[in-house]
Every structure is written in structure tokens, then in C-alpha cells.
From Swiss-Prot:
This is Large ribosomal subunit protein uL24. The keyword Magnesium does not apply. One of two assembly initiator proteins, it binds directly to the 5'-end of the 23S rRNA, where it nucleates assembly of the 50S subunit. One of the proteins that surrounds the polypeptide exit tunnel on the outside of the subunit. Part of the 50S ribosomal subunit. The gene is rplX. GO terms for biological process: translation. PANTHER family: MITOCHONDRIAL RIBOSOMAL PROTEIN L24. One of its GO terms (molecular function) is structural constituent of ribosome. Keywords: Ribonucleoprotein, Ribosomal protein, RNA-binding, rRNA-binding.
Length: 104
């Protein structure tokens, strides 16, 4: 099955502490988890690694977020939107369900 949310898609958070925030998908970990730029930031205590010249300390980084807690952002409507699939010229493409616009 094709993925409804892919890398570099602009998404909006539907639930949780970052509700309403928008960001770009950096990485799709599995069918159910993604990493979004600037969303779900957590503090990680990191040990120094002298061999790699990395300092230790508390580092803020993005954690994975469930796909069910985000939705694709439709720039035409300015809202979160659902995604569907259809065939155009023999290829399977994604489209927004609210206005039937094809997602590039």
C-alpha cells in the first residue's frame, strides 16, 4: 500500500502538545511514525564523545510522532486535509479529498 504521508510533505499536528503547529516531514520511520521538523521536541541527555569531538550536555531534538496525530496541510484551503489515491495516466497519485487537487 502506498504511503499517504511522505518525506518533504507539509503537515499539521492534530493532537498533543504541539496541536496546530505546521512542519515538514524529515523522515518516515515506519507506516505509523514520522519525524517532523520542529515538532515534538524532547530533551536528550548526551554523553560527550571525545573521539568524534562531540560535547556532552542536554540536546533538544525531534522525536517520532504517530501518523494518526498529523494530517497533510492543504495550502489551497489553509486547513488539514484527508488524502486519497487515484490513477492518472496509468500512475497512482495522491489527491486532497476536499478539492480533488493532485498532490505533487
Amino acid at each position: 500500500m502506498a504511503a499517504k504521508i511522505r518525506r518533504d510533505d507539509e503537515v499539521i499536528v492534530l493532537t498533543g502538545k504541539d496541536k496546530g503547529k505546521r512542519g515538514k516531514v524529515k523522515n518516515v520511520l515506519s507506516a505509523s511514525k514520522v519525524i517532523v521538523e520542529g515538532i515534538n521536541l524532547v530533551k536528550k541527555h548526551q554523553k560527550p564523545v571525545p573521539a568524534l569531538n562531540q560535547p556532552g550536555g542536554i540536546v533538544e531534538k525531534e522525536a517520532a510522532i504517530q501518523v494518526s496525530n498529523i494530517a497533510l496541510f492543504n495550502a489551497a484551503t489553509g486547513k488539514a486535509d484527508r488524502v486519497g489515491f487515484r490513477f492518472e495516466d496509468g500512475k497512482k497519485v495522491r489527491f486532497f479529498k476536499s478539492n480533488s487537487e493532485t498532490i505533487k
